[in-house]
């Protein structure tokens, strides 16, 4: 067995770098660290909102590991390493039994807990503090703490935005926000800021209801549109034209808005935050399977019309989106985007295969189901390494695909 594969196997199974007993830094780590720091400074100067988003991602990753570390310590497990980043050490120091530090590549973070499985050698005196020797509830708490922390982060961000900056609130009114000059609505005297009351005798209170009322007619039909121009209600006879983008469909020529920004109180903000998290979790479940599907990656590479919401992306693409959101919506928009990203990452991380946390949770659950009183069952992690290797290979393909698309066909 090669040294590279042995190291790869041990680190995949252990959930982090194998402790070699050294601290400090390496020349390679210092060099790469200086380059990374310079790039962050350059990013802060050239695109402040992108920098804010990237810092938010790094803080989220750090808090993910804090979740693992804190629960491990509270449940009596021994954590020997807590690192931000991967690759060569930039610097590290040891406090007590734990080495803390930063590594050169800011691609994630890890906490090293001893005895994650049967492949992890543990000193006899440390065996009572090994992960594998703890009860199933304690192991499950520690391994899911990272994803739970993402949900806490998302809630705090959603809640903070709703009570300070506010969010969209349904008004029950369809107010014109956009017009196409020369359209049937324009010719009838309807202008931006007017409120549409009814179309063809059907009362409307949202943009969707306006679309539905128009869709009930055919091109060439004349309908009565009642609207409020701010001073009085007016009635206009409008002859609908044909949509150029959807042949055969009637066209009025307005874009209406049925929401407005509103600050929410703590109770309503709590409800909306929980609802946003629940909805994003549901979307993330289907999204994970879509993103992990190699056929989806192939379609994204070969078809420029493939749905952009299904494409794999990297921190490069997400940072581009974060910068654009910051330019248009400011800090509140960036924080909301970070909240959605945290929910997705939390769900993605629970995919039940190594090297995800969900893989460790699945192993712990399998061991619990196979165990009998007085006869604890321990799974052979070595048999799972080929599957974990395939997952890592798939993730590498997704990363390369996402990075290529982020550079060649940036979102937005």
Question: Model-found features: residue ranges?
Answer:
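PDZ-domain C-terminal substructure recognizer with occasional recognition of PDZ-binding tails
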Residues: 191, 197-198, 211-255
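Long, highly hydrophobic alpha-helical transmembrane signal-anchor segments
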Residues: 30-76, 310-336, 412
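Conserved PDZ fold ligand-binding element
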Residues: 185-208, 277
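Transmembrane alpha-helices
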Residues: 1-51, 400
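Functional transmembrane alpha-helices
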Residues: 5-29, 129-130, 134, 244-345, ...
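Internal alpha-helical transmembrane segments
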Residues: 74, 107-175, 386-390
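Final/C-terminal transmembrane alpha-helix of multipass membrane proteins
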Residues: 40-41, 384-406
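Small-residue-rich helix-interface/hinge motifs
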Residues: 2-16, 48-125, 341, 348-370
């Amino acid at each position: 067995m090669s040294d590279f594969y042995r190291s790869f196997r041990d680190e995949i199974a252990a959930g982090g770098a194998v402790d070699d007993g050294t601290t400090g830094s390496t020349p390679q780590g210092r060099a790469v660290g200086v380059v990374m720091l310079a790039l962050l400074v350059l990013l802060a100067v050239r695109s402040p909102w992108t920098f804010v988003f990237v810092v938010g991602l790094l803080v989220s990753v750090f808090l993910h590991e804090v979740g693992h570390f804190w629960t491990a310590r509270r449940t009596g497990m021994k954590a020997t390493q807590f690192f931000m980043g991967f690759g060569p050490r930039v610097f590290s120091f040891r406090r007590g039994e734990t080495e803390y530090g930063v590594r050169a590549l800011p691609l994630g973070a890890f906490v090293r807990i001893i005895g994650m499985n049967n492949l992890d050698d543990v000193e006899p005196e440390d065996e009572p503090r090994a992960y594998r020797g703890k009860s199933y509830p304690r192991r499950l708490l520690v391994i899911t703490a990272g994803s739970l922390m993402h949900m806490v982060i998302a809630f705090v961000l959603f809640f903070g935005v709703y009570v300070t900056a506010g969010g969209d609130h349904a008004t029950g009114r369809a107010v014109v926000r956009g017009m196409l000059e020369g359209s049937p609505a324009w010719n009838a005297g309807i202008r931006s800021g007017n409120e549409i009351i009814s179309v063809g005798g059907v009362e409307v209170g949202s943009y969707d209801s306006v679309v539905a009322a128009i869709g009930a007619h055919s091109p060439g039909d004349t309908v009565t549109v009642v609207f409020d121009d701010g001073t009085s209600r007016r009635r206009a006879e409008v002859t609908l034209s044909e949509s150029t983008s959807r042949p055969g469909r009637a066209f009025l020529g307005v874009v209406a808005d049925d929401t407005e920004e509103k600050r929410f109180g703590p109770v309503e903000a709590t409800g909306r935050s929980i609802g946003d998290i629940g909805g994003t979790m549901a979307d993330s479940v289907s999204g994970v399977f879509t993103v992990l599907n190699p056929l989806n990656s192939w379609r994204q590479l070969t078809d420029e019309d493939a749905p952009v919401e299904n494409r794999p992306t990297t921190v490069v693409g997400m940072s581009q989106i974060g910068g654009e959101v910051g330019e248009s919506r400011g800090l509140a928009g960036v924080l909301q985007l970070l909240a959605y990203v945290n929910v997705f990452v939390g769900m993605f991380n629970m995919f039940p295969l190594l090297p995800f946390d969900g893989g460790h949770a699945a192993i712990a659950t399998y061991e619990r189901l196979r165990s009998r009183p007085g006869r604890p069952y321990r799974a052979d992690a070595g048999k799972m390494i080929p599957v974990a290797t395939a997952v890592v290979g798939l993730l590498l393909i997704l990363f390369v695909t996402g990075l290529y698309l982020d550079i060649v066909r940036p979102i937005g």
